[in-house]
Amino acid sequence: PKGSFGLFDPEMLMDYCRHGLLPNEKGKGYVLACPPHIEASVYMSSRSNHDIYDAVRSLSLPVLILRAKEPAKDRNAMDFSSSPTWPKLASEFSNGREIYFADKTHFLPMEIPEEITKIIAQEITSAQEA
């Protein structure tokens, strides 16, 4: 597989191909099931929502941030190999923690799905026991 797709766990890549792509209505090939402008709007709206910081600080529930490697200073804007997450985000939550994966990319759940699943399951169990 090309580019970042070569980092995906093989089973995750198959799931992505089965469920993340649709036949191209304009002819041969496939297109993303989530239109690129919709996906981009998720990231762009977070940058323009100035009230988000107050909302984050008001939360008292436990929050765990799973963050991939930081972007290189000279990276291309279309390079998705690093995390778009602010490195100090976890500290903005009153009960925030972070697990940092310095050698993983923005596609963290697709790279190490079993490890991510285990972390999520542990968090759910901890919340239920609290």
Predicted regions and their residues:
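Hydrophobic, aliphatic-enriched repeat segments that assemble into extended interaction scaffolds
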Residues: 64-66, 117, 121
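Catalytic histidine-centered segment of alpha/beta-hydrolase-like enzymes
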Residues: 98-113, 117
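Acidic/histidine metal-binding catalytic segments
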Residues: 6-20
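C-terminal alpha-helix
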Residues: 119-130
